Amino acid sequence: MSSIYKLRDFEKKRITVADLKSVPDVLVIEEVKKCFGVSTSIYFIFDKIWENKLSLEIGCSQGLVYGFTRYDDKHERAYKLISFLGEKLNFDFYEVNS
């Protein structure tokens, strides 16, 4: 089951992909996809510490991070990773089940 994790007050916090890239032990990957001839960047975040990779898609709007999407059943690990990022970058979040 997938889940969406949204940042509270993301417009005020102004967290960017560059901010996420600055956190130690976290890897941000950019994938460029073409949709109807238009290139679109999709960002994923990986935790390098755990043996099994955890992948979260980063939701961005006008350069600001507004949330993350998890497509697997690793809820506890995703929650811990986002909590870790929240501590490092000073943001709070909530989960929206989909």
List the model feature ranges, each with a label:
Residues 1-98:
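Acidic (Asp/Glu-rich) sequence patches and key acidic residues
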